[in-house]
Amino acid sequence: GSSSWRRSFEPPPRVARGSIDWDSLKPALGDAQPFAFSDRSPEALPARRFPHLAQTDCRETATTPEIHALIRDNLGRAPMYSGQIDAECGPRYCPSIEDKIVRFADRDAHHVFLEPESLFTDEIYLNGVSTSLPADVQLPLVRGLRGLEHAVIQKFGYAVEYDMVWPHQIDATAETKRVPRLFLAGQINGTSGYEE
């Protein structure tokens, strides 16, 4: 067997686009020209290799000191802070809003990016507000954001706890070193699944 490590993941709430004052928010534009992942690609290649697609309309807002106070007052109700979830850590680059308020207590605001969940739904992903706080805290948290004063939450944030196999037990092909022909991908590798 492999030794594992407990991790957690807390996706943010999803909000109905029609309930957002979209025009009051700052546009958050993507890159006009896509870039290749490899630094070996000549600059002319990306334009030929990647199709030019219409930009998805995203927006930006920010948390406020009032939202931070609401979160601090309810930290004990968040599973990661109450001890209900005992994962050793959450995602390194996408900390929960609770973690941001605790770790960066000197900041008055944190960016929140409003991103369409897909081209075929009106669900908006609130990137930057990952949380597992109860619904009765999430609603005023979300409605405290500028432009979301009348937001309708379609899916509340929540917490997931899972096992992760230590990276030194997996080789570069994603095959486990202890069990031949067993390949792992996704959260069990401690990633979000981008290696597939």
Per-region residue spans from a language model:
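Hydrophobic/aromatic-lined pockets within catalytic cores
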Residues: G1, G76, R146-E149, G193
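An anion/pyrophosphate-binding glycine-rich loop and adjacent beta-alpha core
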Residues: G1-L139
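A glycine-rich dinucleotide-binding beta-alpha-beta segment and adjacent secondary-structure elements
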Residues: F113, Y125-N189
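A conserved FAD-binding loop/helix module that cradles the flavin
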Residues: N189-E196
